Amino acid sequence: MTPAKAPSHAKKPEAGSQPISSMWTQMFPPKPTYTEEHMPDLSGKIYIVTGASSGVGKETSRMLYSKNAKVYMAMRSGAKAAAAMADIQRAVPKSSGALVILPLDLADLSAVKKAAEEFVSLESSLHGLINNAGVQVLDDTNGEARTAQGHEIHIGVNVLGPFLFTQLLRGVLAATAGRAQPDTVRIVWVSSMGTETIGEKGRGLSADYVDYWPLMSPLERYGLSKAGNWLQGAECAKRYAGDGILSFPINPGHLKSELYREGGTLFKLALRPVLFPPAYGSYVELFAALSPTLSTKDSGAWIVPWGRLYPIRSDLLDATKSAAEGGNGHASAFWDWCEEQVKAFL
């Protein structure tokens, strides 16, 4: 494939400035506030965890299964998926829950739709959706990695795929919320600190990305895609509020996971001192998905390691507010843009 080129009018966006105090507390956080010890029995509850074949997704699936939940491990099928499920079953032999592989390829929107339709054909309840899966293609310096629909790989897999999957599951989530205890049906959007370190000033991520992304490094593209997840999590809280569904964008922390598998040796060595075991990322995901300290009033709030509400960069907060509220309304506009990109599959 020919290396990607930006159109002549494209230019790199201005990034906002993350306060040092914010960066420090997210890179070197206090001890976890929510662990396996805090989790209730989840018998009868059903969850989907995307990207469950390794790392944080696998750990989160294990923890939910250990509390007797039925967990749909949404991931690309194959030997790796089967091995991940077998590993969890061996680790938790006494669980009365269930593990089910749900084939999901976020790089193909038609496959995303098929996965959602398969789940809905099997289940009438869904108590939590954890959009954990993501890709970081650090060796794609020429911008040649694309999805089946031709989108740049980071925005396609990390932003549009999860968005479509969530929209297609809204009905079953809403139906479950109508029967469940208030504030217990939730969606978790796994973002990263890249939202604050790289995200566009006042916007996080915008539709302009489709023009300027060839000007950015693969690491920057990844960070910007995570800003997209933050926008989705914040806006979803508003759009789904009437359904009784809570939504939380999170920074799972800097973790030892396969997310960095594309990075070179020096890159991995540089990160080693600040990387934590995958279980710590699961603690953040499960705090967002299960903690009884969270309620409707918190929906849409930024959650950071290892399970804390924390203020997002102030200029980004403006994106979550309408003009009438003193903001710029960008989160709403970005949601509408995402809908436009996936409308053929809704």
UniProtKB/Swiss-Prot annotation:
Functionally, this protein is described as follows: Short-chain dehydrogenase/reductase; part of the gene cluster that mediates the biosynthesis of betaenones, phytotoxic polyketides involved in leaf spot disease in sugar beets. The first step of the pathway is the synthesis of dehydroprobetaenone I by the polyketide synthase bet1 and the enoyl reductase bet3 via condensation of one acetyl-CoA starter unit with 7 malonyl-CoA units and 5 methylations. The C-terminal reductase (R) domain of bet1 catalyzes the reductive release of the polyketide chain.
Q: Which domain of life is it from?
A: Eukaryota
InterPro entries from the entry? NAD(P)-bd_dom_sf, SDR_fam
GO MF, one term, reads: oxidoreductase activity
Catalytic residues at S191 (proton donor), Y222 (proton acceptor), K226 (lowers pka of active site tyr)
Membership in a protein family = Belongs to the short-chain dehydrogenases/reductases (SDR) family.
- The answer to whether UniProt assigns keyword NADP to this entry is yes
The enzyme's E.C. designation: 1.1.1.-
Question: Which reactions are catalysed by this chain?
Answer: dehydroprobetaenone I + AH2 = probetaenone I + A
- Region annotated Disordered sits at 1-35
What are the record keywords, sorted?
Answer: NADP, Oxidoreductase
Q: What name does UniProt use for this protein?
A: Short-chain dehydrogenase/reductase bet4
Q: In which pathway does it act?
A: Mycotoxin biosynthesis
Residues binding NADP(+): V56, K80, D105, N132, Y222, K226
